[in-house]
């Protein structure tokens, strides 16, 4: 999982990337290609 300051660019890396908020943190999740997972922080 990558940890980035801004996730806007990471959302466009793959068409299945989704932006979700969990427990006050922002994540990118991708069920078809899990290597694109990322967290903001």
UniProtKB/Swiss-Prot annotation:
GO terms for cellular component: ribonucleoprotein complex; ribosome. It holds the Pfam family Ribosomal_L36. One of its GO terms (biological process) is translation. Keywords: Ribonucleoprotein, Ribosomal protein. The keyword Transport does not apply. InterPro entries: Ribosomal_bL36, Ribosomal_bL36_sp, Ribosomal_L36_bact. GO terms for molecular function: structural constituent of ribosome. Belongs to the bacterial ribosomal protein bL36 family. This is Large ribosomal subunit protein bL36. The gene is rpmJ.
């Amino acid at each position: 999982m990558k940890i980035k300051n801004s996730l806007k660019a990471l959302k466009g890396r793959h068409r299945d990337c989704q932006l979700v908020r969990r427990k006050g943190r922002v994540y990118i999740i991708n069920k078809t290609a899990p290597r694109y997972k990322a967290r903001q922080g």
